[in-house]
């Protein structure tokens, strides 16, 4: 089984937040001669973190799914993901499945508020059929019990798994399972960024994916709930008989915006996931419901995400909000406006010296085999950060950030797994 980077379109989307700036307040590059240790914050007394005894999820109001697979035929497994390695060498198996069901969309009688305390109700339903990609230990004895379910990112016009790409080394060390979910319409049907459209599932491989059907992003929140419930309830079918004890939902960048709205709108009642990683979000919340892509400002049925959205404080599941420095202080994402205090169920990690996209995620990680070569490549970049990557397709003019994003994210995933 080969897990490989298929092409480089997604890097163009994040390239602008990867280059260093002349403004020292927002410059997150690692200067020549700096080390990873040089990015660490001064030691201070941290708040006590509650470690919870595992509490079974309730899975309330979530529709049942039908599972097909493992899927064969065609080329398959169209997803951009860092790392070229033979999974069998790590004792891992990669399989793909289709899940289908009937999903709800959601609406709210009131505008969605900054505090995240949203009250939503189901609006309408639609049938769907999408795909999930599973990377799991081949042998049950090697399984940690934890499953990470990633809301695949479609900013580049196709499915990508950026959190997997930056943290797969830690997941494999744990012996955990990763499940990537084609949650949004663009990854299945197209219609997004034109750069990636030729790798959309149904366009790139109609033989394999032609029967898929995604009714639109209004239904994505319920699809993500149903995918998580499938991991719990049909593990024999999709995990090769592995039995999960913890299922963590995660999403990065654009998917983190949607994870924010998922947490505020759907998570409290569905209670599917044991905990959540919100990775590199901005200040906004994603739209909850759009009649026509929220293009008509006068459409009363639209329920748009607020300009600033905190994560609601009454959640009873741990949430780790992970932010690179450019997520917080950069002009593109502006998470600083949505910062909120830590609580028993919320932790915010803001990682100095890191960028939304960096030298590891934009190239070095593509050749990381887990043998240490990726580490050496990143350490070398810290002493001489590149100003261009991918044969000059991204040209920054200034050094591309070579900070420790991947390492701190791996630590975050390890800590979240212990926390829940």
Predicted regions and their residues:
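Bacterial signal peptide processing site
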Residues: 20-22
């Amino acid at each position: 089984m080969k897990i490989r980077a298929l092409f480089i379109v997604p890097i163009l989307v994040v390239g602008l937040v990867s280059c260093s700036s002349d403004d020292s307040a927002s410059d997150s590059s690692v200067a020549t001669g700096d080390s990873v240790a040089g990015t660490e914050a001064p030691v201070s007394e941290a708040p006590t973190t509650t470690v919870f005894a595992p509490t079974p999820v309730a899975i309330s109001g979530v529709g049942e799914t039908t599972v097909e697979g493992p899927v064969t035929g065609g080329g398959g497994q169209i997803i951009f993901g860092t790392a070229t390695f033979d999974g069998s060498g790590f004792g891992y198996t990669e399989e793909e499945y289709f899940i289908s069901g009937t999903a709800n969309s959601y609406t709210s009688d009131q505008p969605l508020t900054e505090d995240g305390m949203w009250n939503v109700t189901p609006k309408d339903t639609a049938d769907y059929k999408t795909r999930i990609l599973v990377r799991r230990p081949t042998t049950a004895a090697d399984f940690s019990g934890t499953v990470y379910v990633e809301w695949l990112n479609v900013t580049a016009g196709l499915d990508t798994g950026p959190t997997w790409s930056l943290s797969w080394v830690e997941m494999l060390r744990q012996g955990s399972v990763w499940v990537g979910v084609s949650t949004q319409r663009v990854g299945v049907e197209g219609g997004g960024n034109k750069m990636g459209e030729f790798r959309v599932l149904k366009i790139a491989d109609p033989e394999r994916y032609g029967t898929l059907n995604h009714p639109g992003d209004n239904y994505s929140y319920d699809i993500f709930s149903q995918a998580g419930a499938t991991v719990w309830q049909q593990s024999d079918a999709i995990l090769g008989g592995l039995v999960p004890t913890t299922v963590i939902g995660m999403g990065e960048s654009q998917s983190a915006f949607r994870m924010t709205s998922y947490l505020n709108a759907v998570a409290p009642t569905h209670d599917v996931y044991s905990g959540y990683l919100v990775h590199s979000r901005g200040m906004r919340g994603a739209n909850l419901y759009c009649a026509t892509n929220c293009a008509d400002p006068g459409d009363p049925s639209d329920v748009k995400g607020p300009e600033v959205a905190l994560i609601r404080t009454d959640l009873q599941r741990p949430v780790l909000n992970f932010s690179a420095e450019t997520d917080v202080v950069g002009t593109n994402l502006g998470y600083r406006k949505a910062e909120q205090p830590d609580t028993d169920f919320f932790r915010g990690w803001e990682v100095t010296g890191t960028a939304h996209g960096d030298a590891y995620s934009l190239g070095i990680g593509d050749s990381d085999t887990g043998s240490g070569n990726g580490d050496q490549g990143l350490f070398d970049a810290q002493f001489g950060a590149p100003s261009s990557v991918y044969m000059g397709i991204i040209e920054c003019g200034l050094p591309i950030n070579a900070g420790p994003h991947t390492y701190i994210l791996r630590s975050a995933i390890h800590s979240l797994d212990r926390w829940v």
